[in-house]
């Protein structure tokens, strides 16, 4: 059980906020029955839950083949290891199901507002804030972590990662130098 399970009322906390989804999933399910997709995702959700909860995290929500999870501040290193496990073991699990899908995982660390929210009769834990938005728009073809996540890691976990700096791109100049 995660420390996040004890939050009932809205509060501000610092946490690791990862998003994940599966590459080529929409193509893969195109010629499959809804029942087949449901059975695959049912088993997949259990796999994800087991891995995330083992890292002291919480599955916030699933949306089809995608999801949002959260790890408390004191479990960032365990969370990164869980995400690594999800990438490696999850991709192997997907291959066993004969899917071409792979995990795309992106994570940011920072302040969020979280708690139970929803209709009068159905409230669920959720997280909101710029930290979540940053994680959502990160580019990744595998497992990507922001510098804010990296800074929270111990040296042994840092050694499992390498820095990736994207190539330089050029953009249109507006203003004083645009006429040259």
Where are these regions (language model features)?
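Short beta-strand
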Residues: 58-62, 97, 162
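Intrinsically disordered, glycine/charged-rich C-terminal tails and inter-domain linkers
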Residues: 1-3, 141-180
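Catalytic-core segments of nucleotide cyclases and related cyclic-nucleotide turnover enzymes
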Residues: 114-139
